[in-house]
């Protein structure tokens, strides 16, 4: 009898517990990712803050695995947004951009004076159509940035921007030759230039310039390999012979012009 009463109590309390669970996490900041899917969260939060300053609308971006009750979310979303934005100053409205990762999609809810000319559902579909290709390819950073750009254009009554690739902060120089963006690289090459100029000084002018150029070319390739090794990304294919060759040619010309001997 006692076990039956306990079981009955659990059956009664479980639905109440499930009902009390919030639909989405409390939005304490402009960007919330409970899945850990989106890289560079700080950069996206910064973009959201810029969006708020430029439009007067606070964008709350939330990334969840899935949403269980979309109807309830749309019904209570405005109240959630009002509560989340109550601590923010100089905002005339707020918008929720809810991204789901299990089945990539976007749900959008607005609150306040968000003047876009479209209702929430149609505005959300417009933004989703411009970002879904990125989301399906797991390019969440790109998708969220494009979503903010399209939404901002709608609010400010501007033309819809084209799809844009937004490089991650760490990808600004990803196509540059290894070590070429390192400040210490200039110091290393200056020291190498001085060293080789003394080593090859006691030869004829042409041989001096040729040896100097070959040595600087080989040293550059070694320097690239060292930078890749330190960065734990060493691969022969990532070493740029073109950059090394350019260093060699420039060295050869400089040696011919700066050397006064025959």
From Swiss-Prot:
This protein's name: Inner membrane protein YcfZ
Membrane side Cytoplasmic: residue ranges: 1-4, 203-206, 259-262
Encoding gene per record: ycfZ
Keywords: Cell inner membrane, Cell membrane, Membrane, Transmembrane, Transmembrane helix
TM stretches of this protein: 5-27, 183-202, 207-229, 239-258
Subcellular location: Cell inner membrane
Signal peptide range in chain numbering: none
Native organism: Escherichia coli (strain K12)
GO cellular component: plasma membrane
Topology of this chain in the membrane: Multi-pass membrane protein
Name of one Pfam family that matches: TPM_phosphatase
InterPro entries: TPM_dom (IPR007621)
Record topology, Periplasmic segments: 28-182, 230-238
């Amino acid at each position: 009898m006692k076990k039956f009463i306990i079981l009955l109590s659990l059956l009664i309390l479980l639905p109440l517990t499930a009902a009390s669970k919030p639909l989405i996490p409390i939005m304490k900041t402009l960007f919330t990712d409970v899945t850990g899917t989106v890289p560079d969260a700080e950069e996206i939060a910064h973009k959201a803050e810029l969006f708020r300053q430029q439009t007067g609308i606070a964008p709350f971006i939330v990334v969840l695995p899935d949403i269980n009750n979309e109807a309830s979310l749309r019904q209570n979303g405005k109240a959630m947004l009002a509560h989340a934005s109550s601590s923010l100053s100089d905002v005339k409205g707020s918008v929720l951009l809810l991204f789901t990762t299990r089945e990539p999609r976007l749900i959008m809810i607005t609150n306040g004076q968000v003047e876009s000319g479209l209702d929430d559902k149609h505005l959300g579909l417009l933004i989703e159509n411009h970002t879904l290709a990125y989301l399906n390819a797991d390019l969440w950073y790109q998708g969220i940035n494009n979503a903010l750009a399209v939404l901002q254009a709608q609010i400010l009554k501007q033309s819809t921007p084209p799809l844009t690739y937004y490089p991650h902060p760490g990808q600004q120089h990803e196509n540059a030759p290894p070590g070429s963006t390192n400040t210490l690289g200039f110091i290393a090459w200056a020291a190498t230039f001085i060293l080789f100029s003394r080593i090859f000084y006691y030869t004829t002018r042409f041989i001096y310039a040729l040896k100097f150029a070959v040595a600087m070319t080989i040293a550059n390739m070694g320097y690239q390999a060292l930078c890749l090794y330190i960065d734990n990304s060493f691969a022969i294919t990532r070493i740029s012979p073109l950059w090394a060759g350019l260093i060699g040619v420039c060295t050869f010309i400089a040696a011919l012009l700066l050397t006064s001997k025959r």
